[in-house]
C-alpha cells in the first residue's frame, strides 16, 4: 500500500518528476511544457491536471483526440505475450490529420497504445529532460515505420 502525500515537503529529497504516465495518459509538468511548442501537433488536446495536496506545480495531460483501430491483421502476429508479438499498422486507416492517437484493437485486455508519428516524436523530444523519460519503439506500417510512444 502507498501513502497519500498532502504536501511536497513530505517527500524530503524526492521531487515531482518532469514526466509521468498514468493509465496510458502522458503527463508533463507544467513548468517545462511550452504550449506554443506543441501547437503544431495535430490531434491532441492539453488538459490541466491538479495534484492533490500542497504541491507547487500542476501537470498538463497530453490527450489524443482520436482512438483508431488500424491494426493490419494480415501482417500482424499476436502472441500470448505482447513483447513477442509483431504489430503492423494499416496506413490507409490512419488519417493524415493526426500526429498521434490511441491505438484500439491490439491489446487483449482493451488497453490503448499511444502511437505518434515522427513530427510529434521530435516535438516531444525537444522538451526539457525528455530524453531521460521518453522511450519510443519503431513499429511497422505497411512497409514503413511509425513510432510507438
Q: For each predicted feature, which ranges?
A:
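Phosphate/anion-contacting hairpin/loop surfaces
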Residues: 1-149
Amino acid at each position: 500500500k502507498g501513502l497519500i502525500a498532502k504536501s511536497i515537503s513530505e517527500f524530503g529529497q524526492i521531487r515531482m518528476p518532469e514526466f509521468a504516465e498514468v493509465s496510458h495518459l502522458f503527463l508533463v509538468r507544467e513548468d517545462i511544457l511550452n504550449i506554443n511548442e506543441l501547437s503544431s501537433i495535430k490531434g491532441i488536446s492539453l488538459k490541466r491536471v491538479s495534484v492533490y495536496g500542497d504541491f507547487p506545480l500542476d501537470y498538463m495531460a497530453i490527450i489524443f483526440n482520436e482512438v483508431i483501430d488500424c491494426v493490419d491483421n494480415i501482417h500482424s502476429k499476436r502472441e500470448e505475450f505482447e513483447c513477442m508479438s509483431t504489430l503492423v499498422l494499416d496506413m490507409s486507416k490512419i488519417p493524415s490529420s493526426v500526429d498521434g492517437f490511441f491505438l484500439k484493437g491490439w491489446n487483449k485486455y482493451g488497453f490503448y497504445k499511444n502511437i505518434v508519428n515522427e513530427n510529434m516524436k521530435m516535438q516531444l523530444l525537444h522538451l526539457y529532460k525528455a530524453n531521460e523519460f521518453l522511450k519510443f519503439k519503431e513499429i511497422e506500417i505497411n512497409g514503413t515505420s511509425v513510432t510507438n510512444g
